[in-house]
Amino acid sequence: MAHSTGSENPKTKRKVCGQCENKAALLVCLECGEDYCSGCFAKMHQKGALKFHRTTLLQPKSQILSNILIAAHQFIKEENPPNEGNHPAEASSKSQQKPKALLQNSSEVGATASEGGEGENPRCKVMWEMPFDEEASAQSFREALTQWRAGHQEENKEEEVHAKKPVFIFLDSVEECEVQTNLKMWTEPINIEFTEDSLSYMETLWLKKYRRTPQEQLRTMLPNTFTHPHQATAEAQCTQNENESDSDVEEIKIKSPPLFMPVEKLNIERPPPSLTIVELDDTHGAEFEDPGIAVPYRVELADSESQLSSTFTDYQTCFPCENEIHHHLIFNKGKADLLSLCLRTNSRYHKDDIKDFGNTVESCTYSDEFKKIGETTSFEKNETEKNIDPQNNKDSVDSCMSLGSKGSLPTIDSSTSFIEENSSQDTNTSLKCSNQNERSNLGNSKTAKEPLFQKVTIRKKLIKERYQGPKKFYSVDKNERLDVFPSSSIKGSHSCSEITSTVSEDKMWIPLSSLSGYAGSADALCDQQSDENPLPNMQQQKSGQKSQRPSTANIPISNPDQKDTSCLLFSYTRSKSAAAQMPSRAASEISEIEYIDVTDQSELFGGNTADRQALDTLEKELNILRKPADPSEDPHSLPSEELQAFNDNFLTLSQMSKDLLEMSRESDPHGAESSSSGRNPEIQPLLSLGDYSTDEEEDEFLDKQHVIKLPWEKRA
């Protein structure tokens, strides 16, 4: 027995390699948990993830604190002192938890017992010779764990007494020992204090070098902060009696003032604002002493009818040099007041028209912007109302017949004339008018049948507008309206009115005549009629508004049996062939120039024969190009019955044009010269239209008139 144990001792002192089991283990793999010799470790850790395994040297005699192991053995002895059978079981359970460590201890104990020669004590037996009860060891471990967690004071004190004397035992490996410690809790808080000596010597040098302001300047700025440090250095020099180097070190340790000076708040003085808002009451006129500095105005809150009132004082003294500009600005501010003034003025001229029509036609339509007041004319509004209302279809025929016996003059919107009159007046007069009529206009707007916005958005009848062509998209200026809508009457016997705008059922627009001819002849005839046969303003406007229709023609009919048919047929044919040319600003200027030089037109045309021949050749080429190959291809050809009525109608027109020519010769010698030469732009189309029977020939004739009236012909 002793020999066998003596032979096993040298083998158990050093571990054997786990792979070859022949060589002693030198390395321990931390990932694998196995002991290797150098050769076996190199063979096993060459591929894959094994290359990254870490190793440590095997320490056969490592010293560990074994106070917890001793406490565990003492606990087992105190638990089961009489029961000898349970003690080895509990010891074996502890050896299961710490197998190799306890095996070493038990082997040493067994070796000493065998050397003594007496194995009477069962505790001295080798642990592997004792029976092992797994359930009992598990139960004892649970009980020990619960008692340890409960924290018995007495047992802890005894363990602490034994723990004060640590016992070192030799183990083969660190990994084989599983230690459980009971650390003390730190009751004292950690205090970190920064003193004068906390800065190192290099840090103090850095502070001296990179200081923002020199230290002498800081002493002058903050003298109180340096009194105490100087006294402290003086006491240190007296007590310690050190040399100069030590005194320099003490000066370095003086508390320095803060590196960053406190930032002072900048008080920026702002000047008082030049603009002041003062809320004025009813007595603001007496309190306001200096009217030349500001222009006060009072704005009242808008009620349900969106009323805005503004009052202005001392306008001329404030703005002596900019009356026109501020006149516009003031009326921009009082837009509602000026709008009501315009409406009141327009309503005087439109009262009779509203009664005659018998429907609710408003005097003036409100516009969203102020600039649209001048652009909207009474003729256009009445024209659109007639187009919208289907009940006025009969009135159009009556208007054609009425103009056979009554003359009509071109009408200008009263709102346009009102604005022109206001522009010619002084600033004082305009301001007085706006201030005087302010209250009355607001009262008139209250008594209106419909509110401001309902007139714009809500209509009593459905809107079914006819196609208006490019007329809808181009703005017509007030100077150009005179050229677009001319009408004339001579001596009250006959009248000839040009067709203003016509549209066919297939919505094809064809030009009627040139703008220059329109302007020259219409203005000359209008002036002649106004001199010979003047009419009242109300009668002119009534007849003009009743007769002006975009799809009808104002033609006098001699035969009373053919009044309705001839008028409608003429409007139908002209709707397919003739349309008013939309004027532009350049065209209006040309018409004005031709109107001024209408007396010299015949002389210029008669003197230049070469230009006349060139124009004739152009007419021939134009006729060839305009003539279609097949008459069936003409999209505007009329049936035979309509053509016959059309021819009869134009025979009547030719007879009427001859009478007009004779009367113009008697009244105006210049007009006679131009008509004798055959180039009167107003009468020549009427003379020659009777010779044509188709729309195609009529278009050719109109193109010929365009060529004759070219603008560069006057320059020649």
Swiss-Prot record:
Biased composition regions of type Polar residues, renumbered to the chain: 92-109, 420-446, 527-560
Ranges that cross the membrane: none
InterPro entries reported for this sequence: ZBBX, Znf_B-box
UniProt superkingdom: Eukaryota
GO molecular function, one term: zinc ion binding
Zinc finger intervals, B box-type: 12-58
Biased composition (Basic and acidic residues): 659-671
Presence of the UniProt keyword Cell inner membrane in the record: no
Annotated binding of Zn(2+), by residue: C17, C20, C40, H45
Keywords: Metal-binding, Zinc, Zinc-finger
Protein name as it appears in the record: Zinc finger B-box domain-containing protein 1
Organism: Mus musculus (Mouse)
